[in-house]
Swiss-Prot record:
Protein name: Deoxyribose-phosphate aldolase
Broad class of enzyme this protein falls into: lyase
Record EC number: 4.1.2.4
Keyword Cytoplasm among record annotations: yes
Length: 259
């Protein structure tokens, strides 16, 4: 197996196959569930808006893949600093049956100098998730934070407040996951000594098998080849799947989605 094939198979099994579009429908989510079951294995999860969780749960069960996890988003995509709203959305997502919640960190508040609201918001959502045995990923929106110091600070605050994963991006801003921001975030995980309990998720902009290989190489360099399993690493993507399947000898590499 070539290096690209090997990394593509790894990446496929680490994907949070995503649709977060304004025109999402039950039919599109059902199709996403079907795509998550591939000839070479299943994706780790799908990521969808909360209202689609029940139909996704039903579809995954019916197609014989009940262990594909269902992730959703809250405080999305703007990362506002209203803790009550973020918490209410997170509780609603849990009530819908989410296995994982990806909450947006109040990154604009951090840029303006307010570190406390980010901690408090993540902690409130973590408490709700922990009580329901739901995984919490925190989206820090690296493409808007821009500066290394802010990316580092948002990562640190999120981890201190209980994040199970730190995630680069919503996919809704001009700059999403980059190898540079990925390295900064994973270095925080390393420097804080939390690599056993905290994972990393690049999202948006990871579109090709070669992209995925680059992002995995950074994880392997920092933590060794065995760290990036589905409890410690995810790719938030949709168009990536077709490229991975093509690298693995399935399909033509074309995708219907741009995330």
């Amino acid at each position: 197996m070539t290096d690209l094939k090997a990394s593509s198979l790894r990446a496929l099994k680490l994907m949070d196959l995503t649709t977060l579009n304004d025109d999402d429908t039950n039919e599109k989510v059902i199709a996403l569930c079907h795509q998550a079951k591939t000839p070479v294995g299943n994706t780790a999860a799908i990521c969808i808006y909360p209202r689609f969780i029940p139909i996704a749960r039903k579809t995954l069960k019916e197609q014989g893949t009940p262990d594909i996890r269902i992730a959703t988003v809250t405080n999305f995509p703007h990362g506002n600093d209203d803790i009550d709203i973020a918490l209410a959305e997170t509780r609603a997502a849990i009530a819908y049956g989410a296995d994982e919640v990806d909450v947006v960190f109040p990154y604009r508040a951090l840029i303006a100098g307010n570190e406390q609201v980010g901690f408090d918001l993540v902690k409130a959502c973590k408490d709700a998730c922990a009580a329901a045995n739901v995984l919490l990923k925190v989206i820090i929106e690296t493409g808007e934070l821009k500066e290394e110091a802010l990316i580092r600070k948002a990562s640190e605050i999120s981890i201190k407040a209980g994040a199970d994963f730190i995630k680069t991006s919503t996919g809704k801003v001009p700059v999403n996951a980059t190898p540079e921001s990925a390295r900064i975030m994973m270095e925080v995980i390393r420097d804080m000594g939390v690599s056993k309990t905290v994972g990393f998720k690049p999202a948006g902009g990871v579109r090709t098998a070669e992209d995925a290989q680059k992002f995995l190489a950074i994880a392997d360099e920092l933590f060794g080849a065995n760290w990036a399993d589905s409890r410690h690493y995810r790719f938030g993507a949709s168009s990536l799947l077709a490229s991975l399947l093509k690298a693995l000898g399935h399909g033509d590499g074309k995708s219907a989605s741009s995330y």
